[in-house]
Structure formats: C-alpha cells, structure tokens
Amino acid sequence: MTAILERRESESLWGRFCNWITSTENRLYIGWFGVLMIPTLLTATSVFIIAFIAAPPVDIDGIREPVSGSLLYGNNIISGAIIPTSAAIGLHFYPIWEAASVDEWLYNGGPYELIVLHFLLGVACYMGREWELSFRLGMRPWIAVAYSAPVAAATAVFLIYPIGQGSFSDGMPLGISGTFNFMIVFQAEHNILMHPFHMLGVAGVFGGSLFSAMHGSLVTSSLIRETTENESANAGYRFGQEEETYNIVAAHGYFGRLIFQYASFNNSRSLHFFLAAWPVVGIWFTALGISTMAFNLNGFNFNQSVVDSQGRVINTWADIINRANLGMEVMHERNAHNFPLDLAGVEVPSTNG
C-alpha cells in the first residue's frame, strides 16, 4: 500500500512538472524545446564571453603559428574573435576530454567547436519552441518557418561550410573583423558575388528593408485619428481594440497613385505574407548557395570569355573581379602556402627565342 501511494505521489510530481513546462501562463514560455534550448544557449553564451575576454592564441592553420583573438591578448572589440578550431583537428569532434590537457584544448581552438555546436542546437530548439508555443495558443506555424531562414544561414556558415571544406578552421570566426575576413576569403575562393543565390539573398535583405520601411511609413501616415490636434496620434490606440487603427483604403489609394494601381496591395493578409516571405525566401536561397559553394560548386566564372577576332582578350568586369579575387587569395593564410591554388596549378607558358 505504501509503495502504491509513493508511485502516485511521484506521478503527480512529474505531472505538475509537465504542466509547468508546457504552461502558457508562465511569464516566459519554456516548452519541451526550451528544456534543451536553455542549457545549450547558456553554455554557448558563457563560453563565448569567457573566451572572447581571455582565451589564449589558437593555431588555426595547424602550422604552429597561433593567432590571438581575445581581449587580454591584445585585441579590441573590433579585432577580437573566437578563433576557429585548428586545421590539425579538421572535422573531428573535439570536446575537452579528447585533449591531453586544457592548455592543448585551448591551443587547438576547442572553445570554437563547443560554442558553435551548442549555439546551433540552441537556435534550432528556439525555432522548435516558437512552433510549440504557436501550437499551444492555437496559432498558425509560420513564425517558426520565418525564423528558419537565419537558422539555415547560421548552419550554413558554421557547420555545412566546414564540412564541405574538410575542417572547422574554415568556419566563420566569432567576431566582427573575423566575419569580414571570412567574407573576403569566401569571395576569393568561391566568387560568391557572381552566384545567383547570393544575388537573391541581397534582393531579399535589401528588398525586405525597403518593404518594411514602406509599410511602416504608409501605416503611420494613414492612422485613424482618435485624439485632438494637441495630442499624439499614437495616444489614440487602445491595446486589444477591435477597430482598425489605420485606413488601409487610404494607404492603398496613396501608393496606387504614387506608383500604379496594381503595385499596391488591397488585401492586408496578402500584404503581410509578402512582407514575411520576401526576405525569408531570399535568405533561404543564400544559405543554399553557401551550402553548395561549401562543396566548391562556385559562382559563375566569365574570366577572359570575351575575345576579339584575333583571339585577344577584351577585359570585362568579370576579369577585374578575377584579379581582385587572386589578390585576396594571395593575402589570406599567407604563411600556410606560397601561392593560391589557381596560380600554383597553372603551367608556366613556354616562350620562344
């Protein structure tokens, strides 16, 4: 009898825990995805802060020339970064217990792998938590779908690209100048500016900014005034009010006359779907482009493709980009190799006389 009572009590305790985890009455919703999200993001954030301040130099290229990335080793906020895991480690899973000592783990850039893997797991769980909360509240699932765009982008640069290139040392450093260095080297090696998926991403980001500004300014300019001229129009809104807060007909009429009639949405739901879908689809394509370039399916190459009737090259913008790419490739990892791959692999032309 005692055993039965204890089992009921334990089940009741577990039931209360489940109800608390999945309750939408909490100030912050936890959810089952949150059970994994909270420790992984806390771990990634804590290690990032500590490593950004105090991590010793990392042998990123695997050639016994460590690179400093932390504040205590001479960097500032702009130049500081979490240096990627050493090329000597490659794609190996490298937790602390795999190293002979903590010093060796730090020298080989172990914190980068720890931060990135916990971060990716955490943001994926954050996306799942968005879906879970939407489900509990009876909402549609599109918030999580929209968030999948930045999740895909982060996964592409921190995981898919290193897998394709064969080493976590090719992942994006966790810092401001490190991000720019990653972008420049990516252009040099993959010609990303000439990749159509990157172009779609640029259109998505800049177009999304433009459409967001257009929508916000149109709505703000067509508010239905509920206040006097001496009060702010914003003071006329009551949270949860049933009435429309702006006149979509007026906004439609303005924009239709500014551009042309069919450039303006007359359906608020279609408008907001478009505002969400445009940047999300663009960033999806960019993440897909990064993931294909990870395996060296690079951007378009039109180098020296225009020649005259005598076979002489007519330089185009593509040739200018090619020369810039070679310059950038020569400069990066300058101690790891003497020549960029496309220079080293070309046979020297023979000369007569």
Curated annotation (Swiss-Prot):
Binding-site positions, Fe cation: 215, 272
Compartments in which it is found: Plastid, Chloroplast thylakoid membrane
Propeptide: 345-353
Sites of N-acetylthreonine modification: 2
Primary location recorded for the protein, binned into one broad class: plastid
EC number of this enzyme: 1.10.3.9
Molecular functions (GO terms): chlorophyll binding; electron transporter, transferring electrons within the cyclic electron transport pathway of photosynthesis activity; iron ion binding; oxidoreductase activity, acting on diphenols and related substances as donors, oxygen as acceptor; oxygen evolving activity
Membrane topology, as annotated: Multi-pass membrane protein
Residues bound to pheophytin a: 126
Post-translational modification: Tyr-161 forms a radical intermediate that is referred to as redox-active TyrZ, YZ or Y-Z. C-terminally processed by CTPA; processing is essential to allow assembly of the oxygen-evolving complex and thus photosynthetic growth.
Assembly mode: PSII is composed of 1 copy each of membrane proteins PsbA, PsbB, PsbC, PsbD, PsbE, PsbF, PsbH, PsbI, PsbJ, PsbK, PsbL, PsbM, PsbT, PsbX, PsbY, PsbZ, Psb30/Ycf12, at least 3 peripheral proteins of the oxygen-evolving complex and a large number of cofactors. It forms dimeric complexes.
Protein name (database record): Photosystem II protein D1
Species of the source: Morus indica (Mulberry)
Lineage: Eukaryota, Viridiplantae, Streptophyta, Embryophyta, Tracheophyta
Gene that encodes it: psbA
